[in-house]
C-alpha cells in the first residue's frame, strides 16, 4: 500500500530542503506499509481476488492462461450466507457417515454441511442426536411401561422351569418394532441421561449385603479390566426411584414353607427382557448373583409391600458382562439444602444393620401426601428438611456481658436475609443473593447449626433510657458464640422467636459428634471432596470410566467448607490504628527511585522518561523519532477531530503505545485509529521528560521576558533565549510549533485555537521535573509531622504556593501562545527543521 502525504503549506513539517522532507516521507511510508501488511488478512484477500480478475495488457489475454485461477467472490459469499445449505447431488460422495441417516458433505467452496438422506434435511451445524423434552418424557414413559410389563420375581436361584419358559416366550414374542426402537434409543440415551443426571445425583440404593452387579460397556469403554478403584458411596436421590405396587400374580416367589413373599431384588429380573441384545448366559449369571442366600426367609406381610424400582437412567448403567464389582455398606446420607455445609450425625444415620431394608417400605406408614412432602435425601427415621421461615433480620455479635459494661461500644448491626430450616439458620446478603441463579445458588455468608443452641430474650442496657425498647433475640450456638437478632418490628421478632424455639426444641443434642461449623466470621470456601470425606469409606469397587471421571458429583460441588476456626478466633482483628502504623512503616522503609537507579535495579526507559539529549544521541538525530512519526500520523488521520489535544484518550491504549515505542516498535502507533489516544501519547512524552523542553534554568528568564511591556524588547529577548536552547530542544520545538499551527488552522472544525493549545501545552513544556512534585505530594499526604530528610531538602526545589503555581501556569501558557503567534517572525523558527546531526 502506497500512502502519499503532502505538506499543507510551505511552513509545515519538512519545509526545508527536499532531502530532509523526502527522507521523512520514505521513513513514514515504510512504517505505514509494514502496519498495513500485518493489520488484516481481509484486505490481502480482496487484493488477491482483484488481481485474479481477467485483464488485458499489451494486447495479451490472460483468461486462457492455465496458471491463473478465477473465482467469483460474490457467489462464494452468497453461498456461505444461506441459512440452509444446498442439497448434495446424487453422485456426490460424502466425507463421512455419521450414522442415523446423517452424512457429511462439502460444498464447492470447501464448507462442510450435513444432510440426512432419510428425512432430506440439510443443515450447516452438526446434528446433536438429542430429543426435545416432550420426546424425552415419552421415551421414559415407554421405557417404564416396558419395564412394568416385563418385570418378574425370582424367589430363589433354582427358579421353576415354568417361569423360565414363560420369560423366554415373552422375550421371543416381543414386538420387533419395540426392539428396534430400543436399539435406536440407546444411541441417544447418553444425551438424555446427561440431562436427567444434572437434576439428580448418581444413585446407589442397595441392601447392606454385598451385591455384585456387572456394569455396562458405557462405563468400561477403553478401560482395562483391572482399572477399578474404590469410591465412596454416592448420594441416593428419592427422585430416581418410583414407588409401584408389586402384582402378586407374576411377582411372587415360593419358599420352602409355602409362604409367598416378594423378593427385594425382584427388579433385577427385568433386565433380561429390557435389554434385547444381552446374552442368555450372562443373564443366568446375573440371576445367580442378585439372589442372596437368605432369599427364603419368610415375610409376614406378603401383599402390603411396595418395592422401589430403579429408573431407566440407572438401568442404563447395567449390562451382562463378567466384570463384577462389590457394593457394600453404602449409607443413605441426609442431604441438607445446597447452602448447608454438613450432614446430620444422627445415631440411626450410619446404621448398617441387616434388619433395615432399604428397598422396602411398609405401605401402612406410607401415604402419597407424606411422599410429596419429603425432600431429597430424607433418611429413615428423620424429619425431612424444609424451610420454616425466611425474611430480613439484623444481627450483631454479643461478646460482652451487658451488666459488666460501663461504657459499652456502639453495636454494629448487619442486615441479612435469613432462611430458617429444620436444622440450620442460613444467612444471605440480601433476598436477591438467596434466589436461584440458573441451576445453582450463591454461597451464603454463613450457616449456623441450631443443634444444642439456646434462644432467649435479651434486654440491652443501652435501651434503658429510651421510652420504647426494642425486642432482641439472643441466639447462643453450641460453639458458645452469642448473636443478637432483631426484626423490622416487634411482631416479626416474636414470630421469629417462636419459630427458633420450636426448631431448637425438636433438634437432638450434638452429643460427642463434632460437626464442623460454618460461621460468618470464617471464610466460606467450596470443596468438592468435602462430602466424600465426611462419610465412612464404603467397600465399593466400581470401574471408573472416562464419562464418570468427567462428570463430578453435583452434591459434592455444592458442599461448603470453612477455614479453620482456630485461626480466626486466636488472631484478633487488626484495628484501624494498627493498619495505619503498618502502612507508615512500609512507606518509611521503601527505597527511593534514586537509590534503585544507583543500584541498577531501576533503569530509565529509552524513549519515555528520558532526556531529549539521550534519546537523540541514541537515535543519532536532533528530533526524536517518536515526535516525527506521531505528528505525521495525527496530521494524516484527522486534524478536524473535535477537541483534539483537549479530550483525554484511553489510558490503557496510551500505555500500550508507550511500551511499544520503548521497544522501537511503532506499528501500534500507526494502526491506532483514536486521535485522542495519539494526542495523549504525545502529551505524555513531553510530560515524562526528565528535563523539560524549556530547561529549568531558563524558566525565570522566559517569565521576565514575557512581562516586558515593550514589544520590540520582548521580541529580541525571546530571540536570544531561543538561540540559547540546546540543538535537540530547539529543533524539537520548531517541529512541535509547526504541528500545533497546523492544528490551529483547522479551528473551525476542531474548535482548538492557538490560545487553547497554549493552555494545554504550557504546563507540559515548562514542568519543574519530578523532584518538587513528588516532595509536595509527600508533604501533603504525610501531614505536618512528616518532615523530609536533609538529603531531600538539599536536592529538591522549594515547593511553590498555590498562588505562585497559578501565576506560573498562566505565564507558561502565555509564552507558548506568543511563540505560536510569532513563529513566522523569528529567524530561528523559520529555518527548516534539521533532523540529522
From Swiss-Prot:
Q: Which GO terms describe its cellular component?
A: cytoplasm; plasma membrane
For the Rho-GAP domain, which residue ranges apply? 610-827
Question: Region annotation Disordered: residue ranges?
Answer: 1-66, 150-181, 194-257, 338-403, 548-574, 778-800
- Sorted alphabetically, which SMART domains does this protein's record hold? PH, RhoGAP, WW
Q: Where is the composition biased (Basic residues)?
A: 778-788
Q: Where is the composition biased (Basic and acidic residues)?
A: 162-181, 371-403
Chain ranges of the WW domain: 96-129
Give the top-rank taxon of the lineage listed in the UniProt record for this protein. Answer: Eukaryota
Gene Ontology biological-process entries: small GTPase-mediated signal transduction
Here the segments flagged for biased composition (Low complexity) are 33-43, 150-161
Q: Which UniProt keywords apply?
A: GTPase activation
Q: Which regions are flagged for Polar residues bias?
A: 1-11, 44-61, 247-257, 556-569
Annotated PH domain ranges read 386-505
Name the site position(s) for Arginine finger. Answer: 646
InterPro entries annotated for this entry? PH-like_dom_sf, PH_domain, Rho-GAP, Rho_GTPase_activation_prot, RhoGAP_dom, WW_dom, WW_dom_sf
Q: Which GO terms describe its molecular function?
A: GTPase activator activity
Q: PANTHER family under this entry? A: RHO GTPASE ACTIVATING PROTEIN AT 16F, ISOFORM E-RELATED, RHO/RAC/CDC GTPASE-ACTIVATING PROTEIN
Specify the protein name.
WW domain-containing protein tag-325
Which organism was this protein described from? Caenorhabditis elegans
